[in-house]
Curated annotation (Swiss-Prot):
Pfam families: Frizzled, Fz. Residues 23-233, 292-322, 408-430, 505-529 are extracellular. One of its GO terms (biological process) is signal transduction. This is Frizzled-4. Residues 1-22 form the signal peptide. Receptor for Wnt proteins. Most of frizzled receptors are coupled to the beta-catenin canonical signaling pathway, which leads to the activation of disheveled proteins, inhibition of GSK-3 kinase, nuclear accumulation of beta-catenin and activation of Wnt target genes. A second signaling pathway involving PKC and calcium fluxes has been seen for some family members, but it is not yet clear if it represents a distinct pathway or if it can be integrated in the canonical pathway, as PKC seems to be required for Wnt-mediated inactivation of GSK-3 kinase. The chain crosses the membrane at residues 234-254, 271-291, 323-343, 387-407, 431-451, 484-504, 530-550. PROSITE patterns: FZ (PS50038), G_PROTEIN_RECEP_F2_4 (PS50261). GO terms for cellular component: extracellular space; membrane.
Length: 705
């Protein structure tokens, strides 16, 4: 054998122990993953701790190999650096002590045989708090830190470190579906609970490690019995489908009234933002009942794939997300638009008050000519068409919805299975639902109260006036107040207050209901909340449909009467007056009558002296005839051949014939005013063919005979 070969063999033999040690230290995972602990020498040699993280931990010396198999402090330092994010997360105040005790165990000359590591209680305390955080990041609990490897207790046979205990005290204020105890950061409540043992029916919950929240099982009966859930399903679904039907009819009327000048069209245009918002809210409820409870409210979570849970993060469920979006965003937008309309009504009342004008001016939509009514818009219409107001009314609810999505507080409720905000988080219900609704309601209510006070002052000023025209203005103002938008806004505000009351009562008592474990939870706040949410839309739809149905009914009645009167006039050849009145005309002091007596023309007979006198009342827009009681009014053929209403008015005394029936010496006069209201058949005919109806006159807003 050559000397060089012998030399190489000696070098390999001498270096063999170091190669084995380096290979072992270079693959710590293999040694740490082995189930059997490493061989520990009978007497250990203590060395100073050189790892920065474990200095000033409570002891200064350690020995290698450690309890997880590492033989060099440099390898241990590299391994501990991988736990730095978990340490910064501060899931447990004892985490650093536990890691140092496991990877850099304490060594003392008084006990040179065994390294002193952590006790099992210290390991389990840290594992309970930090394992969910690791799972949230997608990492399992390290096998090298299995708590079963460590001593159960500290005694004279097995020495270990028990730790000082957790510094964080259990939380007293808990989130809905949470419990007192140590939590992880996140959510509106600061720290979310880590287990579900604080709940009365904890076996019906599954704790989600990533979020730390407790999700109830899909079919769990925690607060309500199955019979109560069935009753609530029938009650709310009935109102939801009724509201959906009204919403469809109101939408058709809204689209059909575009450009119309009827009163119903004015209401539709003014309330169009509220109508569209409540259309979407009603559609959201309809989607919930059409898809079903399971399809909307139940699902699986990646952290618990084997359980069907009530949704706590509804953004992953398309049906749940759509129901939430339509209910929450458009519901908040409806509250914002109601507040805007209250502000507009207040401005409109104050703008026409005597205090601001120095005299009484009836608003343009109360009376006056059509040109004036079209040229002067109300304050509500001005606000609904203002770009800044539209941006605020649509933008604030959008900001709220974005906050809910970022915080991931979209969840389903147990009773109805409808997705919303705060069903499983009382803090979210308080901050993201009750607070904004309360702000909108306070703003709108203050404007309503202020406008009502101004309106009462205006009525008092008018009531103290003796002028007849002012008294008539008072009647018009009172009529507008009883049927105007102020009444609607007041009714809407009451319904909104009931909704707010139900929300406040729910988040104020939900902790008591969950902690008691009693299924006798009151139904009324939950049913009232859902009912009022739908009733707000029903009020809007009914308020728009009311004038439309009334106008349609009056038009049908008016057309039927006109056809009947026209047939009677064609049979006799003379029509002395049209009486197709569409409403009550008792607004004047004189008696309103219609004449249908038909007389044969007597053009060849000289006319007797006129027994009546034509009087015009410019203040009321009417023509009065002082007529003897035993005379009937007829119209000559010569008069019907006139083509100018002005000419007819000028020569009216010469072309009327009066035929006495009885004694001419007893003359009793009665004042009669003949007119046709705006919108009647005769008024429409005059506006279309004025030259062919010379016996009709257009006076202001009325068609007069």
């Amino acid at each position: 054998m050559k000397p060089t070969c012998i030399l190489c063999l000696l070098v390999v033999i001498l270096l063999h122990p170091r190669i084995s040690k380096s290979s072992t230290s270079g693959n710590p995972s293999a040694s740490s993953s082995s189930s059997s602990p490493p061989e520990i020498p009978a007497f250990r040699q203590c060395e100073t701790i050189r790892i920065e993280m474990c200095r000033k931990i409570g002891y200064n010396e350690t020995s290698m190999p450690n309890l997880v198999g590492n033989e060099m402090q440099t390898d241990v330092e590299y391994t501990l650096q991988t736990f730095a994010p978990l340490i910064e997360y501060d899931c447990s105040s004892q985490l650093k002590l536990f890691l140092c005790a496991a990877y850099v165990p304490m060594c003392t000359p008084k006990a040179p045989v065994h390294a002193i590591g952590p006790c099992r209680s210290l390991c389990e305390s840290v594992r309970i708090r930090c394992h969910p955080v690791l799972q949230g990041f997608g990492f399992p609990w390290p096998p090298a830190l299995d708590c079963d490897k460590f001593p159960r207790e500290n005694n004279h046979e097995t020495m270990c470190m028990e730790g000082p205990g957790e510094l964080h005290q259990p939380q007293q204020e808990q989130d809905l579906y949470g419990l007192p105890g140590q939590g992880i950061p996140g959510g509106l409540g600061g720290k979310l609970p880590m287990d579900c043992s604080g709940l009365a029916k904890s076996h019906l919950y599954v704790r989600l490690p990533r979020s730390g929240r407790c999700a109830p099982l899909c079919e769990a009966d925690i607060l309500f019995t199955p019979a109560e859930k069935h009753l609530a399903e029938i009650w709310v679904s009935t109102w939801a489908y009724a509201a959906l039907g009204l919403a469809l009819v109101a939408t058709v009327c809204l689209l059909a009234s575009d450009g119309s000048r009827l009163a119903s069209a004015k209401w539709s245009r003014l309330l169009s933002p509220l109508i569209w918002c409540h259309n979407m809210v009603t559609l959201g409820w309809a989607v919930r009942f059409m898809v079903g409870r399971t399809g909307t409210a139940c699902g699986t979570d990646p952290q618990a794939p084997n359980e069907s849970l009530l949704t706590v993060d509804g953004l992953s469920n398309a049906s749940c997300a759509s129901v939430f979006l339509m209910r929450y965003y458009f519901g908040m937008a409806a509250c914002a638009w109601w507040a805007v309309l209250c502000l507009g009504w207040h401005r409109d009342i104050r703008r026409h008050s005597p205090d601001s004008k120095g005299h009484v001016v009836i608003p343009s939509n109360f009376g006056g000519s059509p040109a004036k009514r079209n040229s002067a818009k109300t304050a509500q219409q001005d606000l609904t068409q203002n770009n800044f107001v539209c941006f605020v009314a649509w933008g604030l609810p959008a900001f709220q919805t974005s906050a809910v999505i970022v915080a991931r507080f979209v969840d389903a409720d147990e009773l109805l299975g409808a997705c919303f905000v705060g069903n499983q988080s009382d803090k979210a219900l308080q901050i993201l639902v009750a607070t904004p609704v309360f702000c909108y309601w306070i703003f709108g209510s203050m404007n309503l109260i202020s406008g009502y006070l101004v309106h009462c002052r205006t009525k008092e000023i008018l009531r103290n006036s003796n002028a007849l025209s002012v008294q008539q203005q008072l009647q018009q103002l009172s009529a507008h107040s009883s049927s105007g938008i102020g009444i609607f806004l007041f009714i809407y505000g009451l319904a909104c207050a009931m909704l707010l009351l139900a929300v406040i009562y729910e988040f104020a008592n939900i902790d008591v209901w969950l902690g008691s474990g009693d299924t006798n939870t009151p139904l009324w706040p939950f049913l009232l909340r859902a009912f009022m949410e739908l009733m707000l839309g029903i009020c809007c739809f009914a308020w728009v449909l009311g004038p439309s149905i009334s106008t349609l009914y009056k038009r049908q009645v008016s057309n039927g009467k006109m056809v009947k009167h026209t047939s009677a006039g064609a049979a006799t050849g003379h029509l002395d007056g049209h009486s197709s009145s569409r409403g009550s005309h008792a607004a004047c002091n004189s008696t309103v009558v219609s004449y249908h007596s038909v007389r044969t023309s007597m053009a060849s007979v000289p006319l007797p002296p006129s027994p009546y006198k034509l009087k015009t009342s410019p203040g009321t827009g009417s023509i009065s005839l002082n007529q003897m009681s035993n005379y009937s009014l007829g119209r000559s053929v010569h008069h019907q051949q006139r083509h100018s209403p002005h000419h007819h008015h000028h020569q009216q005394q010469q072309h009327h014939q009066f035929h006495p029936h009885h004694n001419h010496q007893h003359h009793s006069t009665s004042s009669h005013r003949l007119y046709y209201p705006p919108g009647s058949y005769a008024s429409q005919k005059y506006s279309q063919h004025g030259s062919y109806y010379p016996h009709l006159q257009q006076y202001g807003n009325e068609t007069l005979l």
